[in-house]
């Protein structure tokens, strides 16, 4: 869905997001720019409960810039997990860094990144969190 960020942008583009969530087997949100859009997450979480869905997904880390470090990844994932996100979808993993992609942001979570081999620390944290967190 587009423009799910605020209630006013939803009204202009969708009418409302809640009815749309009913059609999804796994409702989801899109959290770009590292913003904390609590209303969007709470709406989706409410739809998950109302429609008896198994979880909620979120596309995250998009447009966060190249200096978005592990702390940012953990902080952004933690608040979303607290609001019911059970499936995290990384915004980008580039197959190549040729052309304009080398200036793309966020930094790709793929083998080109120097910290790629350390990234399982973040993913393991969220795997444990989702195992312990009630659905």
Predicted regions and their residues:
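Carbohydrate-binding surfaces of carbohydrate-active enzymes
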Residues: 1-135
